[in-house]
């Protein structure tokens, strides 16, 4: 509350005084926190909590999520975004005397990678098998990625664009590639099956392995 005084002085030195009281109402100091940003677009959930304060009086809040959607007078709220983008989130406060304040913060949603890989063979005999794998995973914004290979026999290669493996036993094996972005850790997984065939066991018998040259006739089975 302030008192405004005006003093009028005539040319002859006569004075008069007038006073009036003015009131300056406080506005809220608007602020909010964000739970986590950036987040992967798949399964994203952004949590916002107001930390707005006011010296005296009350206020109401209004949220704008930056994608055209809003929330009313709530202290905390959460929101899911449908597209990969940078969003400006705004919180508005209005005091009970109509004083306005606002704050804006930016959040980001990140694209998911698309895991992919090629191999030199999808099947080999056990003896001398040597499988080689190469990733062709992509992500729309070109963010660097890590690639982890799991060969289906408790062996793996971590953080490599290429995988190479020799199997010690026959069987079908599921090769798994997990590609994840360096920023945000957004992940995609791709499985492919390779087959390792058992080696045949060569064996035969001879009915009589010692015979005279004349008239010899060997039988093999």
Model-assigned labels for residue ranges:
Residues 1-221:
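Extracellular/lumenal mature domains of secreted and surface-exposed proteins
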